[in-house]
């Protein structure tokens, strides 16, 4: 059992408290006084213990494309640069390239990712081997996977390990035919399950859907029964008031990817409006080929900055709400209700924020500092499922050079 003491704790009510935290095995055992003796003591030294970040949308194995095909709009980037290279990917590539992404997540205080990609067997193996938490979903489209494979994956990976789970999904309306979309809707009905996909990422995507079906992606997919049990819409940039009414009615998660949307010039999601309307909000980085960083601090700041610019209102968004979206919101979007907060009985997915870094001083408002001036260098420790995987700038029990070598080897072949 580990005792965390002598520092701040971000409580489940998002308040800063000063209590001892005891972690036993993979879970938070006790908050406050404990009669049992700890095996080890972690002196927080005045720093902050808080729930980890959760990355609610990514494509981890796309590390191969970092700085390889930049400065292009989404559809040119996908069709000319990414899809041809993805056709060459094999399972071992997915394993090696995902491992690299997992390392980067840990340095940003991210303990779990929501990954849409291929070869879920190798993604699950990589995540489990490292001790990282991954929620997977299907990238089903007209060219790969099938309704049967999605159902098979759903049943296999929801009982694979404590670190792995699987959600129904498909790539996007513009890459997936009506028959396949109908098949996913039937699975959602069968399992009473939410569905996740890219939606309303670009203006061209929305215009294309209106041309095909006479309505926006959100309205079309809702009509098809995709959101009968909720789900998530990655990006949610070009959404209308009518779309947001569907989000509200169905409990759809708007998963914001500010870095990727800015870099690809896709647009700015109306986050301030979403917050005012009570829309469920989560945050993701998108993949390392389109962002190109896997950095939750950058995402939080970009959301804040772009909203204020877009709205021409310095008070349009509250940084504390954005911090909640990156932690509790993303966790709930991913179905990770058991590791969303610092509370007794929750899984110990925790991070320590170094308050002694220059960017965190002076201490006027710790939580605002995390969003406005925080960066990856304030992550002192990342714990996943009760295991410390990253601490003081070092990875614990992980052969990083092997991971770098294997990822480079895969990248060289795909280039």
What are these regions (language model features)?
Residues 1-19, 24, 34, 324-415:
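Active-site microenvironment of metallo-dependent hydrolases
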Residues 7, 21, 26, 46, ...:
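Divalent metal-coordination and catalytic microenvironments
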Residues 64-96, 130-138, 203-230, 250-253, ...:
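Active-site gating loops and adjacent loop-to-helix segments of metal-dependent hydrolytic enzymes
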Residues 66-131, 151-160, 407-413:
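Alpha-helical scaffold segments that flank or form the walls of functional sites
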Residues 123-237:
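Metal-coordinating catalytic core of metallo-dependent amide/deamination hydrolases
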Residues 201-225, 230-231, 236-249, 262-272, ...:
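Catalytic core of soluble alpha/beta enzymes
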Residues 223-230, 272-357, 373-374:
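His/Asp/Glu-enriched, well-ordered alpha-helical/loop segment
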